[in-house]
């Protein structure tokens, strides 16, 4: 964990993740992206990676080479965080060969589950404009051509993000199953040719106001069960039938008139389009309730079915993800079922063939139609454990899911008494509680 005054954050794989201030997430992620003309992501290989950590500040230097079959790009970065709550990310890059690219540069993700409904203001080439992080999934850009973005979180912390070296647009990534809004620098035209030796520089400056320096919290996660959530039930679960046509939500959201009168609306959930890391995959199921709420606006009264559900890569080429066969796949599947239940989805089908995941889905399928209770999960930063409480007859079935590859300590509340639990990496803990 790194700190910049009142701001705390995680640094992993050359990225800044889960920036928190004032007890809430203010930015989901900041990273440098290189994608070729087929949207294939050139994953960075770091030759320099130095982190200097102070009590209230930090400094990072990094250098990366990004290559695909056609792309070859190198960049150097300098990241600093000060005790005054100011973060700066500078990046200088150069193309090592001619290649076609869809994206090169800094990207900033803003969590939809923490910022949806909050207002913002942008400043740029078209002057100042007011907007809102949308609650429903936006089919068009959320903001365009800006160099500065300013917003206030629900806890009263003001965040100002200034971008240099390019103008930025912001899209709603929930269209693709990601639980975020993404600010990025669009390239000037489709599939531009990047010439060997061409260089570019970008800088992001992020400052927070109105956030006190909070002490680092305890290492454990606290979980408490609440009351039944109206309309939340475990859906009927099945396996995706061979040959099922995959319709992505973006196609539904951008062609609303074609779906307005349907009696049954089916779309896929596959969050593998953008970032493939473990953190991203565990974040993205929380986008499902917003996607379903939007679908119900598009097709009022229609039965909603999510099918297929998978995290196998489909673009730029289909590929089976090896995490299907691991305990990671089991936790991810249980997490998806939780958010399907919160969304009130009636039916869902999975295209995941790993043994642990299939066992979990068979177990959860037995609870189809059961009500779901509220669970309150409290942790320092982003909670590493998720909870699912199923109202089943005389009692409550509680599932605790460790979404990380590290052991986690949990304190489970029963009134004023807390029971300590230790969860192994990607463990699903099951227990019963009286109503």
Regions found by a protein language model. Give the residues of each.
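Beta-strand-rich recognition/accessory modules
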Residues: 3, 31, 65-69, 150-228
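Carbohydrate-binding surface patches
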Residues: 379-415
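Acidic-aromatic substrate-binding/catalytic surfaces of carbohydrate-active enzymes
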Residues: 1-65, 119, 126
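Aromatic/acidic polysaccharide-binding cleft in carbohydrate-active enzymes
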Residues: 305-365, 377-379
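C-terminal beta-strand-rich structural cap/linker in extracellular carbohydrate-active enzymes
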Residues: 421-435
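Polysaccharide-binding surfaces and accessory modules of carbohydrate-active proteins
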Residues: 80-167, 426
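Catalytic domains of carbohydrate-active enzymes, especially glycoside hydrolases
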Residues: 219, 228-240
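Noncatalytic carbohydrate-binding groove/subsite architecture in carbohydrate-active enzymes
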Residues: 241-326
């Amino acid at each position: 964990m790194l700190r910049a005054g009142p701001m705390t954050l995680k640094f992993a794989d050359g990225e800044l993740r889960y920036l928190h201030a004032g007890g809430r997430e203010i930015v989901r992620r900041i990273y440098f992206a290189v994608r070729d003309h087929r949207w294939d992501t050139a994953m960075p290989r770091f030759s320099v990676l130095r982190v200097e950590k102070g009590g209230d500040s930090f400094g990072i230097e990094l250098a990366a080479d990004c290559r695909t079959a056609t792309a070859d790009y190198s960049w150097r970065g300098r990241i600093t965080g000060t005790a005054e709550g100011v973060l700066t990310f500078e990046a200088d890059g150069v193309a090592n060969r001619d290649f076609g690219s869809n994206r090169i540069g800094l990207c900033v993700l803003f969590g939809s589950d923490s910022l949806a409904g909050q207002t913002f203001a942008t400043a740029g080439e078209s002057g100042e404009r007011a907007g809102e992080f949308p609650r429903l999934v936006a089919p068009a850009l959320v903001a365009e051509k800006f160099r500065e973005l300013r917003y206030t979180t629900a806890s009263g912390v003001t965040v100002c993000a200034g971008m240099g070296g390019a103008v930025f647009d912001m899209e709603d990534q929930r269209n693709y199953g990601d639980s975020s809004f993404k600010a990025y620098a669009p390239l000037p035209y489709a599939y531009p040719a990047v010439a060997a030796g061409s260089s570019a520089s970008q800088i992001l400056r992020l400052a927070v106001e109105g956030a006190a320096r909070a002490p680092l919290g305890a290492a454990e996660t606290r979980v408490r069960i609440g009351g039944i959530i109206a309309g939340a039930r475990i859906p009927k679960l099945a396996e995706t039938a061979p040959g099922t046509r995959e319709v992505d939500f973006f196609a539904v959201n951008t062609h609303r008139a074609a779906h307005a009168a349907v009696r049954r609306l089916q779309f896929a959930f596959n969050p593998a389009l953008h970032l493939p890391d473990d953190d991203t995959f565990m974040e993205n199921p929380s986008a499902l309730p917003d996607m379903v709420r939007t679908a119900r606006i598009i097709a009022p009264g229609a039965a909603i079915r999510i099918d297929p559900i998978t995290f196998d890569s489909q673009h730029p080429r289909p590929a089976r993800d090896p995490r299907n066969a691991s305990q990671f796949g089991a936790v991810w599947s249980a997490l998806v079922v939780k958010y399907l239940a919160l969304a009130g989805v009636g039916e869902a089908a999975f295209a995941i063939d790993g043994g642990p995941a299939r066992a979990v889905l068979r177990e959860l399928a037995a609870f189809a139609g059961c009500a779901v209770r509220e669970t309150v999960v409290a942790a320092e930063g982003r909670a590493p454990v998720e909870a699912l409480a199923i109202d089943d007859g005389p009692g409550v079935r509680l599932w605790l899911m460790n979404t990380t590859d590290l052991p986690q300590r949990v304190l489970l509340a029963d009134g004023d008494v807390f029971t300590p639990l230790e969860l192994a990496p990607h463990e699903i803990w099951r227990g019963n509680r009286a109503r």
